[in-house]
Amino acid sequence: MKLFLCSHFSSVGSLIKEEIENKNVAFIPTASLREGYTGYVGSARKLFKKLGAIVTEIDISTEAYLTIQSVFEDADVIYFTGGNSFFLMDQLRKTGTDELLKKELEKGKLMIGESAGAIICAPTIQYIEQMDEKPEDYSQEDDAGLDLIDFYVLPHYLTAPFKKVTEKIMTEFSDLNLSPINNRQGIVIDGEGSKVVCKD
């Protein structure tokens, strides 16, 4: 399985430019839809464009399943923006896109997860509730994540405005295998393991 998990994609995406250049990218902004600040979504769009990617944007909370399936099947790369992890995970599970995504990743496609998009890869997303408020209309009975990895990404570590909350999560969830990364770091996962990469 190929994953690139990060806090801020436009700051580190060039580290994997060979994986993105001239490729078909399914761009999923769903996590950001209820957020006040979404500048990172526009920054990501610009970087994909600069790298010559062919981007198809799709909101999994409103699109028909067959449309999502078609976009995912045509994509080389599936990218999830940051935003609210609980809202994103709820939509993935509610629509069946979670299983569709796993099928496509089994074919060797690359998933890029930024912030919320990285958090959802863990076995559970419960650890992030202090950073991401759970929506009132959250419809799942548990806080299961996609369970693609056996660790828990903690994005924006010691980075404003998340300095205090990330420190708190590190302390309170010390029993979890947390992987803290700042906005200049990313985690590359392939069949052989994972490594943290850094943008100077």
Give the ranges of each region predicted by the language model.
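Conserved anion/nucleotide-ligand pocket segment
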Residues: 144-149, 153-191, 197
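Short glycine-rich anion-binding loops that position phosphate/pyrophosphate groups of nucleotides
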Residues: 33, 83-86, 117, 158
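Glycine/Thr-rich phosphate-binding loops of Rossmann-like dinucleotide-binding domains
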Residues: 13, 35, 88-89, 121-122, ...
